[in-house]
């Protein structure tokens, strides 16, 4: 009976199968990439032994004081000093081409002895011989650096060539969001380089007992140990590594859950329509002795079989999808070893089983609800027609008969269109959400979520002992450059802030004129007076500070009270920054960063190239390029998701339209036959069906667009809230969002309506009379 029923209703059964299969594919794929990401990142971190805490420092320091501190604190399990030789990008070449266009800061390092190892592509500790170099995987992918290529370091009359012998994975600095990259060379080579160019920077790296990071930060600051740089926790490193892949996992899982919900709605609709159509048959079965329980099992079996087959195929397809989307994860982090394959195959099975349980329980509830009628009611074939309502025909006749009848029937039978309406909302939402996310990330104004106002160029001055002199030289040039509309110079340094526990933490501060490139603040405004400070969203949250409250800073052994003037969004430096008018001592500065706006007619790329030739000690980056390099991986991922969601959404719209039309035509065959008997042609009836579906679709697209533009912003903000941006304003491409996407959705549905509605030709009044 089940097999015959599936054969009889091939299209409807196939559509339900497709819904369940697609949701199983996405659920399985999302779980698989999630497992792959977590296990690969954890495996890389374990083999590399990333530090629990890192304190960066430039300049001389007291080695004995550091050693004594380590000896006197039992929670420190291991300690080492990693020396990094910072090299200007203009002094670094790949196959003759300078790195000066790269946003990344580059440092040469030798392999560490105790922990924080740089690994090769087999996730083994990389060994580099003299004259060779290990290049980060980031440069392999972004700049096309390959094994055997030449990397040249050149300054003045000094030059040295290295052969790329290894592509390395750096558990600390793999992510594009980490703006520094380490290049691995031999110990002898780094000593030679240091005597000719570059500047040393030190990383004080700690392995700690669990839960000791807060104690270390407090004790380290209290001991007044070297801290001319940022402090980074291992958890922040892990968060940066998981950010880009975490977004795609969240999106895939969300789509999968929504698809299961839509499949459940379709299932409900199909079961109710089937039971209504076979009401008299069910009545006969009950009359001859079948119990409700037996009938329920019989009808439930069909949908369980469909769900099982869809789940198996979806599981296999989802694993292929997961492996495809996991390629970049494996490339950057490697494959985890051990029993990971069992976990990667096992956890998606649990997801598919959950889907099967949802379908089974849903079938039981829906069928039970529809078997409440008495045997007499079922034998009579009584249905819910009386609940559909009615509409009046116009007294003076039809002006547009097809439109009048279509909207009249839509008014009476709106309940049967709820499922397709929800699917159209979902499809529109699904198309627009990733598209709007990608547009927002790629737009120059996304800079505001990185803690600075929108600008054309970013200029960095760092890695030099005469930082102030370089800044003055840059300022003199900018003042005399007729192409520049405005610029602002910002100091970046660190101070200490009093936290809620009465202890001192490090805080990174930007000091400069905030009015030149203003931000949109979540709350309050930019600091104007010398006693005002603005906090990033995560800093305000962690310090539990609101607008108007006091905050105590300690700089150069002086405690100063500030008033919180504003709270802004920032996803850089782990989302923990601040802005204040604090004059840093030159030796305490990390960098000067200058933001520049050019006059409208000036070509940004051309001007950037010109400034690089003049300002040889500075790093000049167009803001679009800055965003592309920092968030390029995320943007590429969103591009893949955007294409996939368009295809899935159109497929869903076509499937659900086909299914609903088939069910409506079967249910309304009497009405169709009567209309044809009184003079309506097949084309008239097809037009009436098309008007109903397209009216529902246009309304659904409108609602979906509103939700994507509003609720979608909240979703994106929720994704980024852990990184420092809680409230995102979508930057929408109106042509794509409001013309192209709705147009292609309407066209796809129009085509399927045209094809499926041809079935009205088989309904005739003579057949209804015979029946």
Across the structure, where does each feature detected by a protein language model lie?
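Membrane transport/envelope proteins' first extracytoplasmic loop
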Residues: 1-264, 273, 444-458, 549, ...
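Short cytosolic juxtamembrane segments of multi-pass membrane proteins
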Residues: 372-389, 759-771
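Short, membrane-interfacial amphipathic segments enriched in basic
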Residues: 1, 389-404
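Hydrophobic alpha-helical transmembrane segments of multi-pass inner-membrane transport and secretion
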Residues: 8-37, 243-283, 301-318, 349-357, ...
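Juxtamembrane segments of multi-pass membrane proteins
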Residues: 55, 401-530, 534-538, 549, ...
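Short helix-loop junctions at transmembrane helix boundaries
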Residues: 312-350, 698-767
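Short coil/turn motifs that cap or connect alpha-helices
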Residues: 146, 291-292, 374, 546, ...
């Amino acid at each position: 009976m089940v097999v015959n029923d599936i054969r009889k209703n091939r299209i409807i059964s196939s559509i339900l199968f497709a819904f369940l299969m697609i949701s199983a594919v996405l659920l399985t794929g999302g779980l698989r990439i999630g497992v792959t990401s977590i296990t690969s990142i954890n495996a890389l971190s374990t083999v590399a032994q990333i530090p629990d805490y890192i304190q960066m420092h430039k300049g001389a320091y007291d080695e004995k004081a550091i050693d004594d501190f380590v000896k006197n604190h039992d929670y420190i399990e291991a300690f080492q000093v990693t020396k990094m030789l910072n090299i200007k990008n203009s002094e670094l070449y790949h196959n003759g081409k300078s790195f000066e266009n790269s946003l990344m800061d580059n440092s040469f390092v030798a392999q560490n002895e105790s922990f924080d190892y740089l690994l090769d592509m087999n996730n083994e500790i990389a060994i580099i011989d003299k004259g060779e170099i290990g290049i980060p995987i980031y440069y392999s992918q972004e700049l096309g650096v390959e094994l055997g290529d030449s990397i040249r370091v050149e300054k003045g009359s000094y030059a040295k060539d290295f052969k790329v012998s290894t592509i390395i994975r750096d558990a600390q600095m793999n992510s594009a969001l980490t703006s520094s990259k380490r290049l691995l060379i031999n110990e002898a080579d780094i000593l030679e380089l240091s005597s000719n160019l570059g500047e040393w920077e030190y990383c004080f790296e700690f392995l700690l007992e669990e839960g000791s990071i807060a104690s270390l930060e407090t004790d380290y600051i209290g001991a007044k140990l070297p801290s001319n740089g940022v402090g980074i926790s291992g958890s922040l490193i892990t968060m940066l590594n998981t950010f880009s892949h975490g977004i795609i996992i969240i999106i895939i899982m969300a789509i999968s859950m929504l698809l299961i919900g839509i499949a459940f709605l379709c299932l409900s609709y199909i079961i109710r329509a089937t039971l209504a159509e076979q009401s008299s048959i069910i009545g006969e079965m009950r009359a001859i002795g079948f119990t409700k329980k037996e009938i329920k099992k019989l009808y439930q079996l069909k949908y369980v079989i469909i769900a099982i087959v869809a789940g198996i195929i979806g599981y296999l397809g989802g694993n292929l999808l997961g492996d495809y989307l996991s390629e970049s994860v494996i490339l950057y982090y490697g494959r985890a070893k051990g029993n990971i394959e069992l976990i990667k195959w096992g956890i998606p099975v649990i997801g598919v089983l959950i889907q099967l349980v949802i379908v089974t329980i849903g079938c039981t509830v829906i069928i039970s609800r529809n078997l409440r009628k008495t045997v007499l009611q079922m034998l009579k074939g009584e249905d819910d027609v009386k609940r559909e309502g009615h509409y009046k025909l116009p007294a003076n006749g039809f002006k547009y008969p097809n439109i009048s009848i279509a909207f009249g029937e839509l008014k009476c039978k709106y309940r049967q269109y709820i499922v397709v309406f929800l699917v159209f909302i979902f499809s529109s939402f699904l198309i627009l959400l990733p598209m709007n996310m990608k547009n927002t990330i790629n737009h120059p104004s996304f800079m505001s979520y990185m803690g600075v106002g929108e600008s054309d160029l970013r200029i960095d001055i760092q890695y030099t002992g005469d930082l102030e002199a370089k800044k003055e030289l840059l300022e003199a040039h900018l003042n005399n450059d007729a192409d520049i509309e405005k610029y602002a110079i910002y100091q970046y340094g660190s101070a200490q802030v009093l936290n809620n526990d009465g202890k001192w933490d490090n805080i990174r501060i930007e000091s400069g004129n905030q009015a030149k490139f203003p931000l949109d603040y979540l709350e309050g405004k930019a600091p104007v007076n010398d006693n005002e400070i603005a906090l990033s969203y995560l800093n305000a949250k962690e310090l539990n500070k609101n607008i108007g409250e006091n905050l105590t800073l300690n700089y150069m052994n002086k405690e100063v009270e500030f008033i919180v003037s504003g709270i802004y969004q920032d996803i850089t430096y782990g989302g923990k920054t601040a802005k204040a008018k604090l004059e840093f001592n030159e030796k305490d500065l990390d960098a000067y960063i200058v933001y520049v706006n050019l006059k409208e007619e000036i070509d940004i790329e051309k001007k950037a190239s010109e400034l690089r030739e003049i300002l040889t000690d500075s790093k000049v980056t167009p803001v679009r390029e800055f965003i592309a390099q920092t968030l390029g991986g995320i943007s590429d991922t969103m591009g893949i998701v955007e294409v996939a969601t368009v295809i899935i959404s159109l497929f869903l719209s076509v499937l659900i339209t086909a299914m609903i039309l088939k069910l409506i035509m079967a249910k309304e065959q009497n009405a169709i036959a009567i209309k044809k008997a009184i003079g309506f042609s097949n084309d008239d009836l097809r037009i009436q069906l098309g008007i109903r579906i397209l009216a529902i679709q246009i309304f659904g697209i409108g609602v979906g667009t509103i939700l994507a533009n509003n609720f979608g912003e909240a979703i994106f903000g929720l994704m980024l809230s852990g990184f420092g941006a809680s409230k995102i304003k979508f930057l929408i491409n109106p042509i794509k969002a409001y013309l192209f996407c709705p147009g292609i959705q309407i066209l796809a549905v129009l085509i399927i309506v045209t094809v499926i509605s041809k079935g009205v030709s088989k309904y005739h009044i003579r057949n209804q009379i015979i029946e």
